[in-house]
Regions:
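Extracytoplasmic
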Residues: 38, 54-56, 74, 95-97, ...
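Short beta-strand segments enriched in small/hydrophobic residues
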Residues: 54-78, 83-85
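Signal peptide-proximal N-terminal region
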Residues: 76, 80-100
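Second-shell loop/turn segments in exported
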Residues: 13-19, 63-70, 101-109, 130-136, ...
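Extracytoplasmic ligand/sensor domains, especially the bilobed periplasmic-binding protein
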Residues: 130-171
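Short, well-structured alpha-helical segments in soluble
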Residues: 111-131
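Hinge/beta->alpha junction and helix N-cap segments in small-molecule ligand-binding domains
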Residues: 102-114, 139, 160-163
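Alpha-helical protein-protein interaction scaffolds
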Residues: 2-54
Length: 171
C-alpha cells in the first residue's frame, strides 16, 4: 500500500492472501478489483507477478511513493503496462517472463531522501534475483545510488532523472 490515504481493502486482502500462500484467492481478488480500478498499477503488478511462470527475470522499481505518490504512480503504471505486454508476448514461446519488485525510496530531501534511497539500493543489491532497477525519481537520488548499482553490477534506468552527470556515467 502506498500510504494511509490509499488504503484499499480489496488490494490489502489480496496481499494477505499472497502472504498466506493463497495465490488462487489473491488472483481472484485482484482480477475482480481491477475490473473496477484498471489503473491501479500496484494491483496490476501483483496480479502479473502471480501469473508469472518459470523461467522469469526480476527487476525492481524504486520510487518515492510516500512523498510523491502521483509521480510514482505514473512510473508504476508504465512499468505495469510494459510487464503485462512483455509477459503476454512470452506465453507461447516459453521465454523469460518478468516479475517486478516495488520499493519505496521516499526521496524527499527534507526526509534524508538520499540516505533512504542508498539503503534501499543496498538492500536491492543483496537480492541476487534482481537484475536491474528502474528509478529513482530525482537526479540527486539517482546520483547517490549509482555507485551501489555499479559495484553490484545492477543495471539502473532512471526515466525521470534529467542530470547529464548520469548520462556521463553510462558505458
Amino acid at each position: 500500500a502506498f500510504n494511509e490515504k490509499s488504503f484499499n481493502p480489496p488490494r490489502e486482502k489480496a496481499v494477505r492472501a499472497i502472504a498466506g500462500g493463497q495465490s488462487d484467492t489473491a488472483i481472484k481478488i485482484l482480477t475482480d478489483y481491477l475490473k473496477s480500478k484498471p489503473n491501479d498499477p500496484e494491483a496490476r503488478i501483483f496480479l502479473n507477478n502471480l501469473t508469472v511462470k518459470d523461467p522469469y527475470y526480476t527487476i525492481a522499481v524504486s520510487m518515492p511513493i510516500s512523498s510523491n505518490m502521483e509521480g510514482s504512480l505514473e512510473v508504476l503504471r508504465g512499468v505495469a503496462h510494459a510487464q503485462s505486454d512483455w509477459n503476454y508476448s512470452r506465453l507461447d514461446d516459453g521465454g523469460g517472463m518478468l516479475k517486478i519488485a516495488i520499493a519505496n525510496d521516499d526521496d524527499n530531501d527534507s526526509n534524508n531522501g538520499t540516505q533512504i534511497a542508498q539503503e534501499v539500493a543496498t538492500e536491492l543489491a543483496k537480492r541476487k534475483e534482481i537484475l536491474g532497477v528502474v528509478g529513482h525519481y530525482s537526479s540527486d537520488v539517482s546520483m547517490a545510488t549509482i555507485n551501489i548499482y555499479e559495484e553490484n553490477k545492477l543495471v539502473s534506468i532512471s526515466p525521470v532523472s534529467t542530470s547529464v552527470d548520469l548520462t556521463k556515467r553510462t558505458p
